A protein has these predicted regions:
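A short, conserved alpha-helix in the catalytic core of glycosyltransferases
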Residues: 185-188, 192-212, 217-244
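Short aromatic/hydrophobic "clamp" motif used to bind/position activated sugar donors
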Residues: 104
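Active-site-adjacent helix/loop segment of glycosyltransferases
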Residues: 225-280
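Short, flexible, basic/aromatic active-site loop/helix in glycosyltransferases
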Residues: 153-193
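Short, well-formed alpha-helical segments that are part of the catalytic scaffolds
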Residues: 21-38
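Glycine-rich, basic loop-to-helix element that forms the pyrophosphate-binding segment
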Residues: 81-99
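Conserved donor NDP-sugar-binding/catalytic core segment of glycosyltransferases
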Residues: 112-148
């Protein structure tokens, strides 16, 4: 997946995919991006916001927010409204086809970046060319840790997380903790991970092009896990304690039956491609 852009390649480009997302939260994301770009001294950072909502009124409001932030902190923002919603990964692929940079930041609209997140991420990736993907550590809206990086899942663990009552989850704490990779980082505050959350991924663009971007056969869930598995064939996947975000989303099981259906379809596709694990 390469871009036809003939302009000089920027250091960083960013894509955000929205689907009826909270626009107040989207506004806060752009504010955090502007703040996080200040320490980098990057003059221009292209940002493409891809709207899968298929709603003209929503698009008008989203464009107005982009207009307000365009040029602030180097943000060169474009809003793209899709005629068809082909899914989260497909939305990012549209942005990737229009952008070309050394590093690419893939984002959900429901995150906020720490002021040092971008500068720390670029510093780490500059220092180690073997890194294909860098993931942040996450916190929820109340400041509690969110374990965004994951180990390879089993069907049992996914079912526990989605449907089990709390008392039954407590009986399976070790399995759940292992899946959520709740061990500490090493002395350098980084650790290798297996799977990264698509809510926030720094990727080396050359590695991303090698694997062809997102697999668009996933609609909403597990496309990030599939991409992680592919990128692991190109280099290392790391999580850095110095790169921090707040994540306001997640929990597909609480979003209704449609999301549960998308989640199950994505899980089946992922296991068929990368191998079934029933327990563990």
């Amino acid at each position: 997946m390469t871009s036809g852009n003939l302009n000089p390649k920027p250091e960083l480009a960013i894509s955000v995919v929205l689907f009826h997302s909270d626009l107040d939260q989207f506004d806060r994301l752009l504010a955090s991006l502007s703040d996080a770009l200040l320490p980098t001294q990057l003059a221009v950072v292209p940002v493409i916001c891809v709207d899968n909502s298929l709603n003209p009124d929503y698009a008008l409001r989203g464009r107005a927010i982009c207009d307000r932030w365009r040029g602030v902190g180097g943000l060169a923002i474009d809003w793209v409204s899709n005629a068809v919603n082909a899914g989260y990964g497909a939305g990012h692929n549209i942005a990737l086809s229009r952008l070309n940079s050394r590093y690419h930041l893939l984002l959900n609209p429901d995150v906020e970046l720490d002021k040092s997140a971008i500068s720390e991420a670029l510093r780490l990736m500059d220092s180690d060319p073997r890194v294909a993907l860098l993931a942040p550590v996450g916190f929820d809206s109340h400041g509690e840790p969110e374990y965004l990086a994951k180990d390879y899942p089993s069907v049992w663990v996914l079912a526990l997380r989605a449907f089990a009552p709390r008392w039954f989850k407590r009986l399976n704490t070790k399995r759940l903790d292992r899946y959520e990779m709740r061990r500490r980082a090493d002395a350098n505050n980084v650790r290798g991970i297996v799977l990264a959350s698509g809510c926030c991924m720094w990727v080396r663009r050359g590695a991303l092009d090698q694997v062809g971007g997102f697999d668009e056969s996933y609609f909403l869930y597990f496309e990030d896990y599939d991409l992680s598995m592919k990128l692991a064939q190109q280099g290392n996947l790391l999580e850095s304690q110095a790169v921090r975000i707040v994540h306001h989303g997640g929990d597909a099981a609480r979003k209704g039956w449609q999301h549960i259906g998308w989640f199950m379809a994505g899980a089946i596709r992922f296991f068929r491609r990368w191998g079934w694990r029933w327990f563990g």
